[in-house]
Amino acid sequence: MTAGTAELRGRSLWDVLLPLLLLLALGRLWLMPMGSSFWVDEMGTVFVVQHGPRDPSLSVAPQVPQSVYYLLPRAASALFGSSEFTYRVPSLLAMAAALFLIARLAARLIHPRGTWFAAFACLALRGFDYQAADARPYGLGTLVACACLWFLVRWLDSAAWREALWFVVPAALLWRVHLIFWPFYLVFGIYTAERLIRRDTPVAWKRAAVVFALLGVALLPVLFQALALYRQAGAHVIVALPSVRDLVLSLKLGLVVVCEAGVWLASRALRWRADGSPLPRSSRILIASWWLCQPLCLFAFSRLTGNSVFVARYLWLALPGAALAATWVASRFVPATRWKPLAAALGAGVLLLNGQWDRGWPWHHNSDWRGAARKIQELRLGPDTPVICPSPFIEAKPPVWRPDYPLPGFLYTHLGVYPVPGQIWLFPFEDSAEAEGFARQLSGQTLDVSKSFVLYGGQGQVGFWKDWFNGRPELAGWSNEQFRTFGDVEVVLFHHPSR
């Protein structure tokens, strides 16, 4: 066998193995969770699609329907019916397209043969995989961000007006997908300025100014909308102010370090000699800004304003940057002929470590609202059995919350998506004087004369009210049974011993 024949066979082996690994990974990490239960925010998507963005109950969270994303699940459900799988299809397709663009950008910015490695580096990040089966705007946002950078690079390479317009269109769309994506516009400015200053582009300053001015005009309506909503920002804070440790963890340094150390060890053990040239400065600037701008800006905004927006899903736009950073540091030790074997090793590791192999069929989110609602149905409760339902949304506070809050409504959208039998009693998101006053009234007038009642909601909320009702003198002697097989959703059944 000649050396050329051996190389050809080796090449054909990787050309078969890598697509197979990718299909297996996408099947396990993306496709299999598609039919699992919605989590809270996805049920919000269902509410917006079914009731429209102008439903009066959405006034408590006006930022929720402000996204062009909802056009996609609305179209999908109109074509294929309403189901978990259908609502998630737009995100699945968006992330597949984003993965393709990231691979193409890796070829342009790092190495022509680094595409597979970059793709599997993306799949190594759980937040990246999560978006593919999530009926929320983040998958579309990742695709639009990738498209922006792809066309920005092409425009700065060619100076063609057509490429400039192809950049402006998704760039004008990005902020309309989610208002929290504003820091990403710094990536466009930093990369463009780098190439203009170093004269690494045929694009002239005047032409660049025209293109960015056009983009600015397109974004003005969104800017006014964002400024109006900012006045209410404090009412929607769901996380504490981030620490420096939170910032460091958000950068996914583990992936970067593992890729660099693993490839370096392999190169030392196998005596590889990297044959690529150092990355151009502009490529390094683009990768670094993609990786760092979103987390750094949201960290600074949170600390300066006191309104924390440092939420993991708001940072997902930076994950492809982390994957490209991992590919970049690995490229310093990889000969051109070794990219595919290394990508295969990374892909196998991703499938092994991220596959949720403790479950036969992986969940999308650790919230089985569908299973919890089914459990309540299996209890065969009478139509008058009280079912106490705390809202899963932080906005459910007095005075917006009240015991006679009208249904269907956004704050209790889970009751419309996964209905439960019984007489529904609505509780707020968290404890308050008004909530406890209503609970005392309910306990003395309704629960005391019932044979049983149910608590149904998030684990922390149900746990609080279980302890609260256990301490009521009128319920002394009652027993309760907890059902905790639904992730962070819980069902508790209270029984009267002699009824």
Functional labels for PLM-detected ranges:
Residues 12-498:
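Terminal, non-globular segments
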